[in-house]
Amino acid sequence: MIQTLTDLSALRALVNGWKREGLRVALVPTMGNLHAGHYSLVMLARQYADRVVSSVFVNPTQFGPNEDFARYPRTPEADLRGLEDAGCDALWLPDVDTMYPLGTALATPIHAPGVSDVLEGECRPGHFDGVCTVVARLFNQVQPDVAAFGKKDYQQLAVIRQMVADLAFPIEILGGSIVREADGLAMSSRNQYLSAEDRPISATIRKVLLQMRDSYAAGTPRAQVEDAASQALEQAGFRVDYAVVRLPDLSEPGDSYTGARVALIAARLGNTRLIDNLEF
């Protein structure tokens, strides 16, 4: 049966007990309102560890002033049931005072230069500083051997990998595959904001990503691929933040480059901001 913890000393006692038994511990950080994508991360983590801790904490420092912190959906009972079914051993539920004992205004910030300054970093200034700051705290609290993050947030995964390498966290970072709805829409806690009229249109993002991959593979210059993607999304009713092709480190590839790439899209449909990507 899953254990629910709200006290940091109790969490550390539990994890230390596991480690004394020689068990590997994994962490799956979340903000709650969980879905099949989150549960797939628990199952992925289980393949690399003997015990899995998931955290649920809606982190105020990664939301901008006009973003949806106050209305971010919170579904604790459903989250607990789903985590238990997925094989999670412990649920860590810190409050804001536990996570930020000196208050958010005095929180020691962490910034990952370069990778956090482009794309999402330009659209949501300070977002990745908040992500790094809370993830580093979760790493210190849980002391995991392994941590799993979803590839839907591709840039976030890259930012965390850079932070882990730079700060020498002894933690293996796993990237979990994107889990999609039947029509291709990437699962997200924010999908429930979509109106009934917008929900069928939202799957256009996946179709455009596939078109970007195929067009790029056919030799179309990158700038043309990106312009065509933005136009297709706008014609479908989206307001586009970006539709780009990048290298895995998020730098820009030359048109003659034939190695691994990723197409990334961020766009708004109605009041809902959606992100997705496709590696190829």
Curated annotation (Swiss-Prot):
Reaction catalyzed: (R)-pantoate + beta-alanine + ATP = (R)-pantothenate + AMP + diphosphate + H(+)
Pathway in which the depicted protein is active: Cofactor biosynthesis; (R)-pantothenate biosynthesis; (R)-pantothenate from (R)-pantoate and beta-alanine: step 1/1
Annotated catalytic residues: H38 (proton donor)
Function summary: Catalyzes the condensation of pantoate with beta-alanine in an ATP-dependent reaction via a pantoyl-adenylate intermediate.
Name the record gives this protein: Pantothenate synthetase
Nucleotide-binding found in the keyword field: yes
Residues reported in the UniProt entry to bind ATP: 31-38, 150-153, 179, 187-190
GO cellular component terms listed in the entry, alphabetical order: cytosol
Keyword line: ATP-binding, Cytoplasm, Ligase, Nucleotide-binding, Pantothenate biosynthesis
Domain of life: Bacteria
GO molecular function per UniProt: ATP binding; pantoate-beta-alanine ligase activity
Annotated residues for binding of (R)-pantoate: Q62, Q156
Source species of the chain: Xanthomonas euvesicatoria pv. vesicatoria (strain 85-10) (Xanthomonas campestris pv. vesicatoria)
GO biological process, one term: pantothenate biosynthetic process
EC number per UniProt: 6.3.2.1
Family per record: Belongs to the pantothenate synthetase family.
Coiled-coil intervals: none
